[in-house]
Structure formats: C-alpha cells, structure tokens
C-alpha cells in the first residue's frame, strides 16, 4: 500500500521545520496525515476564459476540506492566444504549454502533494496541465472554467446577427462592405461573457477531450461558464479527488491514476471523439504530446486510421454558423457524442474514468439519448445561456425548453446521418509533407477537397497577412507559410489572422494555405498545418518556389509539390551551399527563452514536445 507522498514533509522528528512552515499556512495537528490536494489554478485577468477563476479554487478547496483532505492552491500562467495573435506574442503560445506542465510538476513534487485538481480552460493551459498530470501520475481531476456564450448584435438596417464569435470580429475588420459602425457593434458583441471562446476552438476541444479521456466530469467540455449548473462540477471535483486519493493510498487501487485511466484505448476513444466533433487541429499536437507522458505509443498514422473510420457527427463554429458550444451542450455534450460512437461500434468500451468504472456505466447515466439517463444528466444538459454580458460565472439559471436529441438533423448526429463518412480531421502525406500534415476537414467545403494551384511563398505569418491585405494573393493561389514550425519560428505560430483575412476578403473558399506552423481552432477553410518535417529541419516545404504547382487531394490523403525530383535535389543543394535552412528575408528578435524551447523542440508530427536528448545527446 503506497504511503501518502506528503508524509515526507509532515512526519518524523527531522521534519519539524517543514511542519512549522505547514502550520504557518493554517494546517493543524489534525491535518497531518490527511491527503494534501494541490489545486492548480490558472486565474488571470488577461484572458476571458480565466478571468472568472479567482474564486473557483476556493469552491474546490472547501469541498476537499469537507471530504477530509487538505487543499493547497497555487497558480500557473495562461496565455490568451487571441490577444497574442498576429504579432510576436504568438511565438510564446505553444512554448507556454511546456512552462505550464513544468510549473505544475515543480509545485506538486516540491511540496509532495498527494493529489491534484486542475482548474484550466484555454488553449495551452489544459494541455499543459494534462501533460503534467500524466507525468506526475497521482490522483487527478480536471475541471475547466467553461465555454463563453455566443454573441448577438443588431447592425445597420436592423439586421440581426444572431450568433457571433471572435472570428466574426476578425473577418469583419477586413471586409470593405462592413461599415466602421457595424464593425464596432460586432466587436462589442462577439465575446459577451467570461469563458473560453464559444466555438469548437482549441480550448473547448481540449476541455471536451479531457472528458473523453476520462479525467474530467461529465459536462466539463460543454457546460457554459455562466451556467449555474457549472458550479456543481467544482464542488464534485473537490469531493471526488479526495475519494480517488483514499482509493489509491488506502486501498492500493491504481485504477484511479491518470495513466491507468488515459490508457491506449482511452486515447483511441479521445481521437474518435475529436474527429467526430471536428475538433481543432491543435488537439493532434496536444494529444500526441500527452500520450508520450502517458507511455502510450500514438502516431499520426493511428490518427489517420481513426479519421478514416469515424464519421463526422458534429459541426460547430468555425465549421458551422448554426452551432456553438451552447448547442453542443443542449444536444447532450460529450456523453452524447460518445453514445453515438458507441452505438456505431466506433469506441472501445473497455475504459474507465475518474467517475465511472466503465464506459457503459458512464453512458447509461449521462447519455441523454440513451434508454434511461439520470435526472442529473437531464438537469445538467438543460442549462442554457443567460444572454447577459458578464465576467462572472454561474449567473444563468436559464434552461432550454427541450433538449436537442435529433440524431438526423440536430447538432450531434448519429453515424447513420453523419455529415461525412470520414471524420472532421485528416492526416495528409506526400512529397511536400513526408512525415505528415493535418487539416480540419470539418471546416473545408467539399468543393475544395481536391485543389491545385500555384504557390505563393512567404516566410512569416506577418508576410502572409501583408500579401492578403495588399491583394497580392489571388483566387486559386496556394499560400505557403514556412519557417514557422516549432524550431523555425520558433514556437509554431497559429495562422488565425491569415485565414480570417482570407475569409474577410472573400478568398476563403478560393485559396489554400499550407504551413509548417499551425492553425487556431478558430480557423476554417483549406488550411493545412503541421507540415513535417518543417522547413528549419530541411523539410521539402523549404524547397517550394513561387509558381510551383501544389496539389491537394483530401480523399486520397495526399499533398504534393508537382516539381521533378531532380529539380528539388538541385534546389536543396543550392540552399545547403548557401548556409542551410533559414528564412532569407525575415527580421525577428528571438529571446533566450524561445531559443531554449527551440533547442529541444521536436517535430509537429510528434506533438512538438520537448526532447532533452536534443541537447544532452
């Protein structure tokens, strides 16, 4: 039977100094011997998805104390990708994932905590904490801040824009048909509440996937930040984590540990949910990196296999203008998607979670489309938006009149009535991306699933934006944005502004954008990222020249540069003779912190995680 990790600092004569310090935090004799639960919060006033988290740690802490544990809260950083977008700040976004993972590990191990509650929400925070939880492998529960409500506005002529999000503000900004007054109205209306942006962008995708992996409670991914019902998730997380700690430390039950829950089968199920719901392409990076910490061998080939066999059941903004996270919730959230996949034989039932001994037990209680869902499930998924601008959580007691259980035409469809037989994400390969590239097919009109056009090559996101706004980009072009990979950027910038500006100028369905960088979960259109190897590693994307024909064939999972091999070899020799693989005309200040990340960053095809062997040999 494992001893409490915290006994290292709370027991024995030699630990008098440590106990003295614990006492100074408010602990008493009765607390020594109870499980110490670390609460990793990520409150910050920089990020709407985190601005409301300040007091939520106390809700968890009170529940921990009431269940017989000792709660100790700390904070970690959180970068807002939307605010950091389009300038040098985006270089720091992906590297922050590693900083978050390290900071959680440092705090938990330095203080010998016994269990962990992760209060996350936005893009790199949930994956960073997930990496840490799997690395630490102590009883852990995830509970995120919840999704933002979609916006509403009335513009010139009394036209009602009934559903808005951040991307609408970006695209309107470059649309010459949108007046300054209407742009101002859209800007003020697009992000009306606290919470992670309202579509199936990276933050909400990852919060849904922690639920699918089994490390979060039902409803974690879809319950709005403003919903009163969300408060109960924080209370239950505090109660549950103490129960998990007791099962492990008092009963030697290793089934409660993150690596037991996030098994190979659980990761396959998570990828199935990901492609079924058309999640952000960033999820591929994050799940690959998390799988490394879980000791689970997952490759892009595995993801490709899932994407070919699992149908696209759900299209949410930015892939749709009809559905947002509040609609996913009304349709039953992740339990409903898992339920449809289970009925289609597309998930492995032999998995368990922090809250259920099996997938069947989970779905029997929480799938509102099942035979006999629990009253708790019916109550939770009726939670509706409040429609009031606020930065405070839990204020809405509004309820949907009915749930959306329409499996034919509703937000979440059955396998029989899927949007497409293939999933919402696909892995492409070819001579332009020998190690793979990723595209969110749920956001690509089927008319663009095959595309051929001349390359227009730029070597930074900023240059891509300039080319789009200055009308250098024409319909039919394939924009190549290179040297923006994990090492080449460094930091693998997101290309949200280029895709949003293409859309705003009416070129979204007429162009393709290919990069060794990545895309925001808010991107849509024929946007192919994670091209591997990246240009800085000598990948073929470094060899592309203006005017080269590029061919994309999503049904065949191909992406090819239509240039003879001999010509490509000659270009490679020329580059290597002139100093190797680096951008020719880019001025960018790269800090020591970013250089340190770049020195250890691996390929996007392996999650862009760090590998210390790159510097230690």
From Swiss-Prot:
Known pathway: Amino-acid biosynthesis; L-isoleucine biosynthesis; L-isoleucine from 2-oxobutanoate: step 3/4; Amino-acid biosynthesis; L-valine biosynthesis; L-valine from pyruvate: step 3/4
Give the protein name, as stated in the record: Dihydroxy-acid dehydratase
Q: Which key words are in the record?
A: 2Fe-2S, Amino-acid biosynthesis, Branched-chain amino acid biosynthesis, Iron, Iron-sulfur, Lyase, Magnesium, Metal-binding
NCBIfam families assigned to the protein according to its UniProt record, in alphabetical order: ilvD, PRK12448.1
Q: Which reaction does it catalyse?
A: (2R)-2,3-dihydroxy-3-methylbutanoate = 3-methyl-2-oxobutanoate + H2O; (2R,3R)-2,3-dihydroxy-3-methylpentanoate = (S)-3-methyl-2-oxopentanoate + H2O
Enzyme active site = 520
Binding-site positions, Mg(2+): 81, 123-124, 494
Does the keyword section mention Glycoprotein? no
Source organism (scientific name): Parafrankia sp. (strain EAN1pec)
An example Gene Ontology CC term for this record: cytosol
| Residues annotated for [2Fe-2S] cluster binding in this entry | 122, 197
Entry cofactor note text?
Binds 1 [2Fe-2S] cluster per subunit. This cluster acts as a Lewis acid cofactor.
| Cofactors required | [2Fe-2S] cluster; Mg(2+)
HAMAP family assigned to the protein according to its UniProt record, in alphabetical order: IlvD
Q: Name one GO biological process term.
A: isoleucine biosynthetic process
Q: Which family does it belong to?
A: Belongs to the IlvD/Edd family.
Q: InterPro entries attached here?
A: Dihydro-acid_dehy_C, DihydroxyA_deHydtase, DiOHA_6PGluconate_deHydtase_CS, ILV_EDD_C, ILV_EDD_N, IlvD/EDD_N
**Which of the residues bear the PTM N6-carboxylysine?**
124
Q: What does this protein do?
A: Functions in the biosynthesis of branched-chain amino acids. Catalyzes the dehydration of (2R,3R)-2,3-dihydroxy-3-methylpentanoate (2,3-dihydroxy-3-methylvalerate) into 2-oxo-3-methylpentanoate (2-oxo-3-methylvalerate) and of (2R)-2,3-dihydroxy-3-methylbutanoate (2,3-dihydroxyisovalerate) into 2-oxo-3-methylbutanoate (2-oxoisovalerate), the penultimate precursor to L-isoleucine and L-valine, respectively.
Could you say which EC number(s) this protein's record lists? Answer: 4.2.1.9
**Assembly and interactions?**
Homodimer.
GO MF, one term, reads:
dihydroxy-acid dehydratase activity
Do you know which Pfam families this protein is assigned to?
A: ILV_EDD_C, ILVD_EDD_N
Source organism superkingdom? Bacteria
């Amino acid at each position: 039977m494992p001893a409490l990790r915290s006994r290292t600092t709370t027991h024995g004569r030699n630990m008098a100094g440590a106990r003295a310090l614990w006492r100074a935090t408010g602990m008493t004799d009765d607390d020594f011997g109870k499980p110490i639960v670390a609460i990793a919060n990520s409150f910050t006033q920089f990020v709407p998805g985190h601005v409301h988290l300040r007091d939520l740690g106390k809700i968890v802490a009170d529940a921990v104390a009431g269940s017989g544990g000792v709660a100790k809260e700390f904070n970690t950083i959180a970068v807002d990708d939307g605010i950091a977008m389009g300038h040098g700040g985006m270089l720091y976004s992906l590297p922050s994932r590693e900083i978050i993972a390290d900071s959680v590990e440092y705090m938990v191990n330095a203080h010998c905590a016994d269990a962990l509650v992760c209060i996350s929400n936005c893009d790199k925070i949930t994956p960073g904490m997930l990496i840490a939880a799997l690395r630490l492998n102590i009883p852990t529960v995830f509970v995120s801040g919840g999704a933002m409500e979609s916006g509403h506005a009335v513009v010139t002529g009394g036209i009602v824009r009934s559903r808005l999000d951040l991307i609408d503000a970006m695209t309107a900004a470059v649309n010459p048909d949108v007046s300054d007054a209407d742009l101002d109205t859209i800007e003020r209306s697009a992000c009306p509440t606290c919470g992670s942006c309202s579509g199936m962008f990276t933050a909400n995708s990852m919060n849904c996937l922690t639920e699918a992996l089994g490390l979060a409670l039902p409803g974690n991914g879809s319950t709005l930040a403003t919903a009163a019902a969300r408060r109960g998730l924080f209370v239950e997380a505090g109660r549950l984590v103490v129960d998990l700690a007791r099962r492990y430390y008092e009963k030697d039950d290793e089934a409660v540990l993150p690596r037991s829950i996030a098994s190979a089968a659980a990761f396959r199920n998570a990828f199935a949910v990901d492609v079924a719901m058309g999640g952000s392409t960033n999820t591929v990076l994050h799940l690959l990196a998390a799988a490394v910490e879980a000791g689970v061998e997952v490759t892009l080939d595995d993801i490709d296999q899932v994407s070919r066999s699992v149908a696209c059941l759900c299209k949410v903004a930015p892939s749709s203008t009809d559905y947002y996270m509040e609609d996913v919730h009304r349709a039953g959230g992740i339990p409903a998607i898992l339920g449809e996949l289970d009925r289609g034989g597309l998930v492995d039932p032999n998995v368990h979670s922090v809250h259920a001994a099996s997938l069947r037990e989970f779905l029997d209680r929480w799938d509102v489309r099942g035979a006999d869902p629990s009253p708790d499930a019916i109550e939770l998924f009726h939670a509706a938006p409040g429609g009031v601008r606020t930065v405070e959580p839990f204020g809405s007691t509004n309820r949907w009149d009915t749930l959306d259980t329409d499996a034919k035409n509703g937000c979440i469809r059955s396998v029989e009535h899927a949007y497409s037989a293939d999933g919402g994400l696909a892995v492409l390969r070819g001579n332009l991306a020998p190690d793979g590239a990723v595209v969110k097919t749920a956001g690509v009109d089927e008319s663009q699933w095959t595309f051929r056009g001349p390359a227009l090559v730029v070597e930074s996101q900023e240059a891509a934006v300039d080319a789009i706004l200055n009308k250098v980009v024409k319909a039919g072009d394939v924009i190549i944005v290179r040297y923006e990979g994990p090492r080449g950027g460094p930091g693998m910038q997101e290309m949200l502004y280029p895709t949003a500006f293409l859309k705003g100028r009416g070129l979204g369905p007429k162009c393709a954008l290919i990069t060794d960088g990545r895309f925001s979960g808010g991107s849509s259109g024929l946007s192919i990222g994670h091209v591997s190897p990246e240009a800085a590693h000598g990948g073929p994307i470094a060899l592309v020249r203006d005017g080269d024909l590029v061919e994309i064939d999503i049904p065949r999972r191909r992406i090819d540069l239509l240039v003879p091999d001999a010509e490509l070899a000659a270009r490679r020799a020329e580059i290597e003779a002139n100093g190797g693989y680096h951008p020719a005309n880019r001025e960018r200040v790269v800090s020591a912190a970013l250089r340190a990340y770049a020195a250890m960053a691996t390929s996007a095809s392996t999650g862009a995680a760090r590998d210390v062997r790159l510097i230690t040999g």
